Amino acid sequence: MDKGKKVETVEKQENSLPWVEKYRPTTLDEVAGHEGVITTIKKFVEEGKLPHLLFHGPPGTGKTTTIIAVARQIYGKNYRNMILELNASDERGIDVVRDQIKTFASTRQIFSSGFKLVILDEADAMTNAAQNALRRIIEKYSAHTRFCILANYTHKLNPALLSRCTRFRFSPLKEDAIKHRLAHVIEQESVDLSPEAFQSLLHLSSGDMRRALNVLQACYASVDAGEQISEELVYDCVGSPRPADIRTVLQAVLDGSWESALHTFSYIKQSKGLALADMLTAFAVEFQKLDLQNKTRIALLDGLSEIEWRLSSGGNESIQTSATIGVIKQSMELEASS
């Protein structure tokens, strides 16, 4: 292949990549946040004493990125041949453990020294039988294979499996860490983002870097060249209610009649394409900002959680919309009577 064409092909592939992959850190120094965790893992790698690892925490907090950076540091360019990466939520049965993992763990790489690495993502989705089989394989092949288990929830993992790993908690990323990374991507991709949209993106990411980058890319793809990304577009891409819309609904519920409140509520819900479940969460956030008595706050949250439960159980959304108005009006009457 002509050298010029090859360079052009590589650039084209990079441009077509999701930004989550395109800007994924390749070294431990580039990983955002979790300074304490990264420092400890660096020490393990430098001393050549990497134990079996368990990274747990919410999605988008850097679990996969960190272990891939570890693999790159240990194996260099050869890292793809020395790791087995599986998503346990897709392949969660005992056959995967018996076949793929056991086969990989039991064979040595020719011309390669040191241990191999098995990365098991979303391991909390594995069946109990598969987890028990994995525990036995970890015991048997520890001499030349290391295991890194990634999970959102540790309570779904076998205690015997947990005891064989060194655990690290990946908390939701702090706003500053996400802000720094987003600013880098915005500069590299020449994204025109309003200050209000940037703040909304930080707020809606809720400590999830993956979500922040995916929403940013979706917004960028939605606008014409040179057009600025607005705060409203960010909320539309996420599918979350805008705070201004939530305040409008609350004002209508508190000030108007039942009919006008229901009309305003239904209009905003339908015109913005919002789900009532998302609006309930937004109401709860908005009520946290108000100076309410404890008993009022309890009544509100108790009522909203009851409606959320009914929705998840298949309740009619129109009826639950009316019920939401009732909960808010009743709670505010309780506040006024005290």
From Swiss-Prot:
SUPFAM superfamilies linked: P-loop containing nucleoside triphosphate hydrolases, post-AAA+ oligomerization domain-like
GO cellular component entries: Ctf18 RFC-like complex; DNA replication factor C complex; Elg1 RFC-like complex; Rad17 RFC-like complex
Binding site for ATP: 57-64
Lineage top rank: taxon: Eukaryota
Assembly behavior: Heteropentamer of subunits RFC1, RFC2, RFC3, RFC4 and RFC5 that forms a complex with PCNA in the presence of ATP.
Protein's job: The elongation of primed DNA templates by DNA polymerase delta and epsilon requires the action of the accessory proteins proliferating cell nuclear antigen (PCNA) and activator 1. Subunit 3 binds ATP.
Family membership noted in the UniProt record: Belongs to the activator 1 small subunits family.
Protein name: Replication factor C subunit 3
Species per Swiss-Prot/TrEMBL record: Blastobotrys adeninivorans
Lineage: Eukaryota, Fungi, Dikarya, Ascomycota, Saccharomycotina
